[in-house]
Amino acid sequence: MSTIQLEAQSRTDMGKGASRRLRRLENKVPAVIYGGSKKPMAIHFSHNKVIKALETESIYSSVFDITVDGKVEHVILKALQRHPYKPIVLHMDLQRVSSKDILVKLVPVHFINEEQSPGIKAGGIVQHTMTQVEIRCQAKDLPEFIEVDMSKVGMDDVVHLSDLKLPKGVQLTVDVADGSHDAPVVSIHAAKVSSTELEETPEVPASAVPTTDQGESAE
């Protein structure tokens, strides 16, 4: 579970007009929380605190706590609506979860120890084919990210989905057993030489090479 904690207040004013007033006059983010055995609830957050929380990567893929009128709820972020060009959050959807709920989430992939990779030391270029993977697990087992250790990845090596070391209780949503869905995650290949670098240096004609005048010696 993420260490993120946000405080919210319930609201009774509904509709687009009420949401606009919250955003413009009170600098609040309207939101809704739903799921579990409780009824959906309209709430709002401090916009500044939401912006700060969104700087933390784990809020997009982890279970975190919100406090609504003094009561703690365990939630995941289901949807986030942003202004098309202003740094403003327009609305948030949050889903209540319990520890045993089965979740399907996209989580980020972190590549560690790249500086120790034999392939990189040999001048290879890293190609990150995936930066996140979809997993299935109970809420209590939901990781903030999946690590890929690059310390032993050599030149022309490819790390596939089947090579990922998943935490206990976590599964990929795709079946990689038969290989047809075993997509590459990261690879290292030799740097490509551009065509201009491959062009041969043009030959210099003999007539362009200066010669030394050794004239006849006087007797």
Curated annotation (Swiss-Prot):
Signal peptide: none annotated. Residues 209-219 have a biased composition (Polar residues). Pfam families: Ribosomal_L25p, Ribosomal_TL5_C. This is one of the proteins that binds to the 5S RNA in the ribosome where it forms part of the central protuberance. Part of the 50S ribosomal subunit; part of the 5S rRNA/L5/L18/L25 subcomplex. Contacts the 5S rRNA. Binds to the 5S rRNA independently of L5 and L18. Disulfide bonds: none annotated. Keywords: Ribonucleoprotein, Ribosomal protein, RNA-binding, rRNA-binding. Residues 194-219 are annotated as: Disordered. Gene3D superfamilies: Ribosomal protein L25, beta domain (2.170.120.20), Ribosomal Protein L25, Chain P (2.40.240.10). GO terms for cellular component: cytosolic large ribosomal subunit. It comes from the Bacteria. GO terms for biological process: translation. This is Large ribosomal subunit protein bL25. Belongs to the bacterial ribosomal protein bL25 family. CTC subfamily. GO terms for molecular function: 5S rRNA binding; structural constituent of ribosome.
